[in-house]
Amino acid sequence: MLVVKADYKKYPIPVLEKMRIDEDEFYKKYEACVVVQTCNRIEAYFDTEVNSDIDCILNDFSGFDVLKGKTATFHFLRVSCGMESMILGENQILGQIKTSFQKARELKKTSRYLDGLFLKAIHVGQRARTETKINEGGVSIGSAAVELAEKNFGLTNRNVLLIGAGEMGTLVAKALLEKHIKAVIVSNRTYERAETLAEELKGIAVHFDKLKEAINFSDVIICATSSPHYILKKEDLNDVGNKIIIDIANPRDVDDAVREFENIKLYTIDDLRNISDKNIQKRVEEVPAVEKIINEEYEVLMKQIEKINIEEVLKDFNSYVEEIRVKELEKAIKLSKTKNPEEIMENFSKAFVKRITHDFVSYSINTSKEDLMNSAWWKNGK
């Protein structure tokens, strides 16, 4: 196998965006290949048994790193487990691999080898996430905010107000999607953005001038705007009942004086960083367990590939023998009018064996023992 890759470790996101592969053109040009592209990763996987012109591939992917053989296979298994992701153990990459593989299969661009490899990688990614805690705990600020709210207040059947529909608000929204929330309300100065995010969350969008009513209705408030001024001041929160407010904005959205209310618990981005850092450390501690799974499954994969190779060799050899049989049989049929059956069968069997041994000897004379053991000599002997 051959992998060409470019990712966030080497290139900034704007550069990666310019390096993205035109998948329509890619799949028109190559066979036995799969492209996996995310916002911070571009990778193409090639079955080199089919794509033998490696130089052509390398010329097309100037600037990409190149991995081959065992190194390429281990890399892909690590990618599927989230071990190569910007956020260690993240779940999204596994779904992206599945989608990319499905597209290549629908286009009939995979091979028996790539089918086995991708199915194994998906299985390994699933094992890593079910048998270890590599994907547990919020490590982004957005997911940490949701985790904090759930831990301190519980989110099941709660009403959550999200103030801000920008980048940070969207991160929170993605984390909220996994929870059994009663209702989600999204408010933003640009109402259309609130509407779009609310639709994704199957929630409700409210205009900014209706914020007071939304606060009264909510149990948990998450603030994530880019405003240079406070969105919520102390006077805005008189008589609103018990609330948890999580302020992940920078600069802050909520006046610290809000802490004076006994019925309101205010958490800031500093509290979330502590949670995020602890969760990252927990994930790092799971790395050896994931690597053990990868090593185990790699050995299983190698046995599967060896079996596939043997089956392909036997198939090719049978075709080679059948080709000789047909040719020698045609000669025997032509002789059937002038010679007796016993003589014809004798000549046929000798010619059949002689042709096979001749091809083998011709190829093996100038071939090392190691190369001979690893070769399909009958292809070269023709």
UniProtKB/Swiss-Prot annotation:
Specify the superkingdom: Archaea
- One Pfam assignment: GlutR_N
Q: Residue numbers for the site described as Important for activity?
A: 75
One example GO MF annotation: glutamyl-tRNA reductase activity
GO biological process terms on file: protoporphyrinogen IX biosynthetic process from glutamate
Q: In which pathway does it act?
A: Porphyrin-containing compound metabolism; protoporphyrin-IX biosynthesis; 5-aminolevulinate from L-glutamyl-tRNA(Glu): step 1/2
User: What CDD domains has UniProt attached to this entry?
Assistant: NAD_bind_Glutamyl_tRNA_reduct
Question: Which amino acids does the record list as binding NADP(+)?
Answer: 164-169
Keyword entries, A-Z: NADP, Oxidoreductase, Porphyrin biosynthesis
Fetch the InterPro entries from UniProt: 4pyrrol_synth_GluRdtase, 4pyrrol_synth_GluRdtase_dimer, 4pyrrol_synth_GluRdtase_N, GluRdtase_CS, GluRdtase_dimer_dom_sf, GluRdtase_N_sf, NAD(P)-bd_dom_sf, Shikm_DH/Glu-tRNA_Rdtase
Q: What class of enzyme is it?
A: oxidoreductase
Function of the molecule: Catalyzes the NADPH-dependent reduction of glutamyl-tRNA(Glu) to glutamate 1-semialdehyde (GSA).
Protein name per its UniProtKB record? Glutamyl-tRNA reductase
- UniProt source species: Methanococcus maripaludis (strain C6 / ATCC BAA-1332)
